[in-house]
Regions:
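Ubiquitin-like/PB1-type beta-grasp interaction modules and other compact soluble beta-rich domains
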Residues: 1-87
């Protein structure tokens, strides 16, 4: 048995103002198995603390379906963080 921890790789997408704050629209991230969307977002907040101010108004999606922040991640998932939409 290997002592090296396994990881999962997910694709992360940012939209709207979040692209600027996060430093890009798309990124691949390696996480520990069992990680949840909220933990993924926390990784980005650790790098870009300004993202924390958007957390309460964001919606997350997993594989193009709305998802709760407590949703577990799986290898190959595509996670998108979407700011509120406004329009006229």
């Amino acid at each position: 048995m290997s002592s090296i921890a396994q990881s999962i790789r997910v694709k992360v997408l940012f939209f709207g103002r979040l692209k600027e704050v996060a430093g890009g629209a798309e990124e691949f991230v390696e996480l520990a198995p069992g990680s949840r969307i909220e933990e993924l977002f926390a990784c980005f907040v650790a790098r870009q603390p300004e993202l924390a101010r958007y957390r309460r108004s964001l919606v997350a999606s997993r594989n193009q379906e709305f998802a709760a922040w407590s949703t577990p991640l799986h290898p190959g998932d595509e996670i998108a963080f979407l700011p509120p939409v406004s329009g006229g």
